[in-house]
């Protein structure tokens, strides 16, 4: 008996009519897409990349400790040696020349230079003569300072934090874009499911009405033409049902793929209600958009980068100089300890420069190109700001209009459904023509679809405004993840 019960359960579960359904709301689909979709994983990876790029930038302004050297530096060969009389002889050499250098350096953002301290040890082994010598720098301090040149460190310090902030805001925008995309796929399936429900109901209703019409024809209450019209309606309903089933299957697959879901259960989507009606202050929307959006940060970054190009062109096309100076102690000897006994002063000063004298206007041309690019960037940013503001105004107005539109289409849906029910009952009582019944059916279907499409437009507009402002107007707070 127990085995029979188990077999019955397995039969009903596997039978198509008893297929398991998974009911999902719009909020659940959005949450799943943000959590497990490929797009969400790409957004997380992009945020990690942005974080480590900024960490790398910060590290450039901190002291750098490094150890470099050559161990071993072994050579065994014949080399030419010029003799006092001008002749050349070839002598065998066999030696090892090893070097270790420990250096601590610090970049100076204000000037673009570098200061450093270092210690160096060198050992030379002459295997042919069985001789070993040591040379070393126990201590040395130095500076490398560009003069009249472009300061990359200074400008990076202005631009890189903006890039980091821009990347963080882009991550939030990416998740909100995922919510918008998921909403699109959600309503694509929901519309398909509603069309399927309409098609199933229309097929069932047309089948019932056709059978009633056959009985009426036998009683002489309707004409043969009316019966044929109802038969055509039944065939059309059957064809629409097949198309609706295919569309629903395709839309379901697309939604599952976007969510990253491998659940084989059929999806049954809930018809979402519109969000609680809330007032949207256009000024607040603009302020939040310019405070939160990555594009707003990008406006400042683009202007700084344009100014950076101008400064680079001016600095690098004129007098360029570089000052290198060191001061330290050095010594040599037969033992390592000899290097540290009574070391001698070690100084080095070098000033290198390049002064363009005749360039045939090349340097001026480069500077003018940079200035023109800066002017173009300013104009582009100004245009982008105007477009940005226009998008906010448009989206705020659209959402406010759609809040009202949803209520009207919902009311029209209820009225059309009631009207169809009355028309159907009147037709059964032979109080309504086939044509009028068909009109009521079409109006019912159109009103239902219009309501679902109005909901789709509303929720897409809702999430679009969130993307544009990165602000939650329901909760009155900034969006953060």
Region roles according to the model:
Residues 69-141, 269-281, 311, 324-355, ...:
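Small/polar, glycine/serine/threonine/aspartate-rich low-complexity segments that form flexible
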Residues 42-57, 174, 178-199, 215, ...:
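Amphipathic alpha-helical coiled-coil segments
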Residues 30-34, 86-89, 226-227, 261-324, ...:
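Amphipathic alpha-helical coiled-coil scaffold segments and their short linker/junction regions
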Residues 66, 73-75, 82, 263, ...:
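Acidic, low-complexity, intrinsically disordered peripheral segments
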Residues 31-41, 48-63, 99-133, 141-159, ...:
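A glycine-/polar-enriched beta->alpha junction
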Residues 158-164, 168-288, 398, 402, ...:
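Periplasmic alpha-helical coiled-coil/stalk elements that build and connect Gram-negative outer-membrane
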């Amino acid at each position: 008996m127990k085995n029979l019960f188990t077999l019955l359960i397995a039969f009903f579960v596997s039978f198509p009519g008893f297929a398991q359904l998974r009911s999902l709301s719009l909020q659940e689909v959005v949450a799943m897409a943000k959590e497990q979709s490929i797009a969400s994983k790409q957004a997380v990876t992009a945020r990690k990349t942005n974080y480590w790029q900024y960490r790398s930038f910060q590290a450039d302004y901190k002291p750098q400790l490094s150890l470099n050297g050559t161990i071993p530096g072994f050579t065994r060969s014949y080399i030419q040696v010029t003799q006092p009389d001008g002749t050349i002889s070839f002598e065998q050499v066999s030696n090892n020349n090893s070097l270790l250098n420990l250096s601590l350096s610090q970049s100076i953002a204000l000037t673009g230079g570098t200061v450093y301290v270092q210690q160096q040890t060198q050992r030379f082994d002459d295997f042919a003569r069985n001789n070993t010598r040591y040379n070393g720098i126990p201590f040395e301090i130095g500076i490398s300072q560009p003069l009249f040149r472009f300061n990359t460190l200074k400008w990076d310090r202005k631009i890189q934090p903006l890039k980091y902030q821009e990347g963080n805001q882009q991550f939030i925008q990416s998740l909100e874009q995922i919510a918008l995309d998921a909403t699109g796929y959600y309503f694509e399936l929901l519309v398909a499911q509603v069309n399927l429900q309409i098609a199933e109901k229309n097929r069932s209703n047309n089948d019932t009405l056709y059978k009633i019409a056959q009985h009426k024809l036998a009683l002489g209450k309707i004409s043969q033409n009316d019966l044929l019209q109802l038969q055509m309606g039944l065939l059309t309903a059957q064809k629409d049902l097949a198309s609706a089933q295919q569309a629903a299957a395709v839309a379901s697959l697309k939604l599952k793929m976007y969510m990253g879901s491998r659940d084989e259960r059929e999806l049954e989507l809930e018809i979402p209600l519109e969000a609680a009606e809330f007032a949207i202050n256009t000024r607040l929307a603009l302020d939040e958009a310019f405070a939160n959006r990555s594009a707003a940060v990008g406006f400042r970054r683009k202007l700084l980068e344009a100014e950076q190009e101008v400064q680079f062109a001016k600095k690098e096309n004129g007098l360029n100089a570089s000052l290198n100076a060191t001061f330290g102690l050095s010594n040599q000897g037969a033992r390592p300890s000899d290097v540290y006994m009574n070391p001698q002063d070690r100084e080095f000063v070098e000033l290198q420069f390049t002064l363009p004298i005749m360039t045939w206007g090349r340097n001026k041309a480069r500077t003018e190109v940079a200035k023109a690019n800066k002017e173009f960037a300013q104009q582009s940013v100004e245009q982008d700001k105007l477009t940005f503001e226009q998008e906010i105004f448009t989206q705020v107005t659209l959402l406010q209009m759609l809040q009202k539109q949803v209520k009207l289409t919902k009311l029209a849906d209820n009225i059309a459904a009631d009207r169809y029910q009355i028309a159907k009952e009147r037709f059964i009582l032979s109080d309504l023509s086939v044509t009028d019944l068909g009109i009521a059916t079409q109006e019912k279907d159109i009103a239902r679809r219009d309501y679902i499409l109005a909901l789709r437009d509303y929720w897409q507009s809702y999430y679009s405004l969130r993307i544009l402002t990165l602000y939650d107007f329901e909760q009155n707070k900034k969006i953060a993840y």
